[in-house]
Amino acid sequence: MATTKVKYPIWLDKSFTVPTNLAYAVYKGNDIIYTGMPKGNDNTTNIYLRDILKNYLSPMLVASDDGYLIKNRDQCGNFSISVYGEQEPRYEILTWWDWSYDNDFYNLVNRTDGILSQVVNTHWHPDQIIPITFYNGTNIHDYYYNRWEKDGTVQSDELNTYDTTYPVSTLTISPVSYINFGIKIDNSLAISWPEKDKRPCASGSLYYINQFGGWDSFLLEYNIVESVDVEKQNYQTGADYLSENFDNSYVIKSLRNSYKTNTGWLTEGQSYKIYHNLLTSPMIYFQNFNGNDPQRLIPINFTKTNFEKKEFKNTHHLVNYELEFKEANIRLRD
């Protein structure tokens, strides 16, 4: 039995080959969750793991204007799928602790489980949450939220350093040699503790679906300028000789918060992840650490995404994105 692990979200992928003379399907119980046919002009075709798993791992967040409070961790679930018509599935093994397509030598040498932080510049904040969706055997869209702090609190000392926890969600893929090769996928949670981790200065965090259907976050470490847009609908009343009455009255008033911030200078690789994942994401939420309810998830829409670039003689450059976004929902007042 060969066992490998895939970090969540699926920034790294796996593939296995299917001969051209075999049809292919993936089942969960009696339900077909993915189908594919080999290409006619090749001897084999590649089936990618992300195509099978993205519907199970992509988050289904529900956040109303009243906000959504972060819940405690629930019991993790596991499920199994089977690949039919394949005799010896071959996997393209990639380093599962790597968040990008480059080798993370620090994690390779010093850690066996990696760290689960936002993938752009690996900065993390104790108030950040990690939403994960898994299949529990009955419902695909079970999910839980966490505030990842040691024993529910942040431990500090005179040096203003903090002991924090890094959650690691792994997917274990085990091809088993039966009549049909099965792929068992266990969504498990392991927690490791670094000795010290300085608490970063940050104002909030963005949570978004990446291009693989997984869930990522980006820590906003610079000032956030907040404003409120107020729109009013009014109606004209008839002539009234009583001075205390209003000739022009408002029927309803709507309020929508707007925010402005920037990412700071990012490298080319970090900028690529922002551009291809955050700015084009179909679902984005904002958590305001300094708001009235720091545990609230706010659905937002980007309204402006300008950037400035520093270019150097070695042809490399740094990019700073100016982000402006609004709450996706309005608040109404009579």
Model segments located where?
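Extracellular/virion structural assembly segments
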Residues: 133, 188-334
